[in-house]
UniProtKB/Swiss-Prot annotation:
Protein name, per record: Potassium channel toxin gamma-KTx 4.6
Organism from which the protein derives: Centruroides limpidus
First-listed, main subcellular location of the protein, grouped into a coarse class: secreted
Location(s) in or outside the cell: Secreted
Tissue expr: Expressed by the venom gland.
Functional note: Reversibly blocks Kv11/ERG potassium channels.
Sequence similarity: Belongs to the ergtoxin family. Gamma-KTx 4 subfamily.
């Protein structure tokens, strides 16, 4: 689910990050971005 994407992610500070995107899409969201080293999923 979405929270596990955030927990697992250690990404660059901002912008597109493939693993966030993939994880978020699996959780049913449209896309994922990186914000302050955490994945944020956009519904």
């Amino acid at each position: 689910d979405r929270d596990s994407c955030v927990d697992k992610s250690k990404c660059s500070k901002y912008g597109y990050y493939g693993q966030c995107d993939k994880c978020c899409k699996k959780a049913g969201d449209r896309a994922g971005n990186c914000v302050y080293f955490k994945c944020k999923c956009n519904q």
